[in-house]
Every structure is written in C-alpha cells, then in structure tokens.
Amino acid sequence: MNKARPIISGAVGKYYEFQITPDFGQGKVSLQDAWLNVAYIPQAQFQMGKYKAPVNLERLQSDPALQFIQRSQVQNLVPNRDIGPQIWGILFNKRLTYNLALMNGVPNNTSSSDFDVNDAKDFNGRIFLTPFRSSENQWLKGLGAGFGATYGHECCSTTSTYKTWGQTTWFKYNSGVTASGVRWRLDPQGYYYWRQLGLMAEYAVDDQALNLISTNKGVLTSQTHNFHNAGYMFQASYWLTGENASYSYVKPRNPFNPFDPFNGGWGAWELAARVSNVSNQTRQFQLGYANPSVSAKTATEFAVGLNWTLNNNVKYWFNYALTEFYQGAGTTARPTDLPAESVFESQLQVAF
C-alpha cells in the first residue's frame, strides 16, 4: 500500500485552521503534516508546523490531482516537507500568492525527521501569479507562472540520494561527503490550462557546498567545493471525456454508473505524458565526491499514463515509466551506463 493517510482537519473558531495527516502506508507510520494556520486576513496569514515546503509547483499539487502516481525526477533537487513558520497570503483578487518561510532545512526529496539537530536554517520563498484568472479571455484564463527559492547554511548534514520511479538509487555521494556551507535552490515554474488540455513545466537548480574527507597514502585530507545539479520536467494531459483541465482535482462530468454505461456514465478519462531529467555536475565526479561506476551523471524519465476518475472520490491510475541513464555502472576507469529501468504501476485511490 503506497499511502494510507486519514486526514484530520478543521477550524477552531473563525480564524484558526489545522490539519494532522498521519501516514500508515509502505509498512511504516509517519507524520506527513501537522500545522496550524491563523487567517485573520487572507492577505497575511501565519502558518506554523510541518507542511510542504513552499518551493516546488509539482510538490504542492495535492496527490489526488496528480497526473502520475510518482512525481518527476525534479523532486530529487527540492525539499519535501519541513518544519517552521511562514507568512503567506493571497492578493489582488487571487491573482498573486506569496510565501515567506523560515524552515529547519532538509536534504533534497526528504521530509523533516520532526527533530532539529543543528542551528542551521533555510529561508524559503515563493511567488505565483495567475494574472488572467478573472479574465473573460478563455485562452489566458488558465495561465500561471511563478518562482520558488531556498537559501540556507548547512553544517555537517548528510547528503540525499537520487531515486527513480521504482525507488532505485541512481545517484549518491561517496562516504565522507557531507553538506557543509551555503546551499541554495532556484525553481521557476508554470502551468497552462485550456479546456481539456493541461500543461505544466518546471526547472530546478540545486547548489550546495560539500565537504569531502578522504585518506590519500595515509594522509587525511579535507576539501570543500560548491556543486550545482539541475533538472527539468514537462508534462501534458488531456481529458478524453471533455472535463476542463485544472491544477486541482477534476471531478467527472458523468460519474461511473455500471448499471447505465450507455448514457454517459463512464466517469472521466485522462491521457498524460511527461518527460523529466536531472543532470549532475561533472566536476564532482572528477574530484572524487561521486563514483561514475556507482552513480549516474544523468537520468531521463519518460512517462505515460491513462487515468480513470470514477466519481468525486475514486480514481484509478495506469502509468508506465522508462528511465535511461548516462554512466552509473562498470568501473571507475571505464564507466558504462546503468541498464534502463522500466516500470508499470497502477493505483486505486479513495479520497474523501
């Protein structure tokens, strides 16, 4: 079972909102979300607790609304959930959303362990514009674009590993490598929705200072360098049954009715395709931070999906993903390419 998340949410009085989301999936128990939001005015709200870091567009999209079971390779370059306070708001008749957060700081594609073990912190910021949201122009109404970023100083923390759709590790740093110094991330992002068509694109850059402690001929050496890794994703989707595409969960025009399928009760069917890529800076292999016979320099994922939304609560995904690599096998002197990974995955989700 991939996810089992009974969401407890509500409001205390008029201005206080809360959410607690435990997860019992994958044979373990974890706390995904636990936050309190104070919303006296929509333009300047205050949130505190554990929640999705306000950086990445794909990450911030709710799970039921996703076109694919697994998010793209870009997630290897951005944070997942973190702990801290944020000020955020919605301005100009919902045309602009902003977030300013002070977070504990987590490695890429990971969530906070619920404990802060050092004094280092990350500043997260995001701004997203939907300038034509209230326009009568249907061609521009569904256009949105924004920018997310983080900046922080890491001290002796572990580095993250990069994983495929099938959760195979395709990149990791050598032993003796720790994050030690400034780390920043940039994430330009955008989407476009028009009638049944949906498009989403994102580009992410992760730059961090890494320290390598190694032994050479019995002599202990230490070196610190900055490296940046970059990635992109682009996806397109189309509702075959005529629903209007959206960043939010799409409800079927005609919910599935097995007793009357010939009168339109087939639910909603969506076709989706995605390409995503992460490229690691070559210099970190040359300086001994990573081994090209163990870790790939690049991974490119191609994914297609056919999704069936039966009603307002039930959705079925049928996804296929092919991931190709450059290097990651062989020997250090003569690295070869990792074999491509091919995954077919289906998922039935009940959300209420």
Question: What does each model-identified segment do?
Answer:
Residues M1-C155, H228-N263, A268-Q286:
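Outer membrane beta-barrel
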Residues V38, W139, A149, S157-F352:
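Outer-membrane beta-barrel pore domains
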